[in-house]
A protein has these predicted regions:
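Forkhead-associated
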Residues: 73, 92-151
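Intrinsically disordered, low-complexity acidic Ser/Thr-rich regulatory segments
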Residues: 1-86, 139-164
Length: 164
């Protein structure tokens, strides 16, 4: 009888711990801390959405998606992040919300002959305050992308940036 009671208490505690985490995660999605920059992202592969989610700026660098490990990979990181700390991706769409103002770096990495990644180029991504404005385009490296963020989400499309 005592063992059964102890087991029941342990089970209830485990359920409560999981519920607490679930409620906290759910609460995060609805109440965004205004001081944090939010990046909501979608990963598409072969014109199909394979992943969707969101991150805060303190979770960068962040890998959006990978296309069979081929070259021309890209990642978005906070400005000033060293290249060797940046993960890399080959294709991504991401949305910048109105609180995500600031500067970011976009890194491009290519596979070298021995199959190891090396940094090839980087560019600056600037998110500014502005009126309703939506951008969707292929990133060209060695240039600066300026986006205006507002209550509508801004889309940046990154696809095979090594090709120009």
């Amino acid at each position: 009888d005592l063992m059964g009671l102890i087991l029941l208490i342990v089970c209830i505690l485990i359920i409560l711990i999981f519920l607490k985490d679930y409620i906290r995660l759910g609460g995060k999605k609805t109440t965004i801390n205004k001081k944090q920059k939010m990046i909501v992202y979608e990963v598409h592969q072969n014109n199909k959405r394979i992943q969707q989610g969101w991150i805060t700026d303190d979770q960068l660098p962040f890998q959006f998606g990978r296309n069979a490990g081929s070259g021309n990979d890209v990642v978005v990181v906070p400005e000033g992040t060293p290249a060797d700390e940046a993960a890399s991706v080959s294709r991504a769409w991401f949305y910048i919300q109105k609180d995500a103002l600031g500067n970011y770096m976009v890194y491009s990495a290519e596979l070298s002959g021995d199959g190891k990644k090396r940094q090839s180029e980087k560019k600056k991504l600037v998110v500014e305050n502005g009126n309703t404005w939506k951008a969707m385009h292929t990133v060209k490296l060695q240039s600066e992308v300026r986006l205006k963020a507002d209550q509508f989400q801004v889309i940046l499309d990154v696809e095979n940036p090594g090709e120009s």
